[in-house]
A protein has these predicted regions:
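Active-site-proximal segment of tyrosine recombinases
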Residues: 57-58, 162, 169-181
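Short, structured motif recognition centered on aromatic/hydrophobic residues
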Residues: 1, 46-47, 74, 93-100, ...
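Basic, alpha-helical nucleic-acid-contacting "clamp/cap" segments
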Residues: 68, 77-123, 132-136
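Catalytic-site neighborhood detector that most strongly recognizes the C-terminal catalytic loop/helix
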Residues: 78-82, 179-204
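Short basic/aromatic active-site micro-motif
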Residues: 40, 146-168
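Basic, Lys/Arg- and aromatic-enriched nucleic-acid-binding interface segment
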Residues: 20-54, 158
């Protein structure tokens, strides 16, 4: 699977600055994302709701959905490690099913849900998505909480998801499993960011 992407397709997992979108920033960004191409919008919303790495989202397979004891589940193939399952909401399952049906109707049977339109045997490419989102941000003059044009990186959706998990008071092992981490040390980054957000909000009050 690692041969499906070139180096520029996938953003680095670790960045010098561990930033996370605020709730208001997410609302503004998603309001515009939902007006984009329908399959790109679905891909980005699913990516946010899963909290996966972008490579894992882009290589989701049409048979990834299952039900176990009445609970919707998704099977995720990780480029870096292995495959694993996690529970998902009914709303997310419906969004995934719509994405699967869209691709099947347009391209027939494919290996991936989100495909490259010119080469549907390959997954949708990250840089193509980023280019379109950045163009949208420029066109709409979409600004963050500091009055600056939005920066965009899909890792920030994962940061947002991870921080939200820590705010639910889940234990480190559960958070690591939901994020697809094999080790616990990465969870501390999300806890640190959650504490920083709380401190920032307190200062604003």
């Amino acid at each position: 699977m690692e041969h499906l992407f070139i180096n520029t397709d996938i953003p680095p997992e670790v960045n010098a600055e561990f930033r996370v979108y605020s709730d208001d920033e997410m609302k503004r960004l998603n309001a515009e994302i939902t007006q984009m191409d329908v399959q790109i919008a679905r891909c980005l919303l699913i990516h946010q709701m899963l909290g996966t790495r972008i490579s894992d989202t882009l290589t989701l397979r049409p048979d990834c959905l299952t039900r176990e004891n009445g609970q919707d589940m998704i099977e995720i193939y990780q480029v870096k490690t292995k495959r694993y399952k996690k529970p998902i909401s009914k709303e997310l399952a419906k969004l995934l099913q719509s994405s699967i049906e869209y691709t099947q109707e347009k391209f027939g049977d494919t290996e991936y849900i989100f495909v490259n339109e010119k080469e549907p045997d390959r997954p949708m490419q990250y840089m193509a998505i980023k280019t379109k989102v950045m163009s949208m941000i420029q066109e709409k003059q979409l600004k963050d909480d500091h009055g600056e044009l939005f920066g965009f990186g899909t890792h920030m959706f994962r940061h947002y998801y991870g921080v939200k998990l820590t705010e639910m008071h889940l234990d480190d092992w559960t958070i690591a499993r939901l994020l697809g981490h094999k080790r616990l040390n990465n969870v501390q980054h999300y806890r640190k960011m959650s504490n920083q957000r709380m401190a920032d909000e307190t200062r604003e009050v």
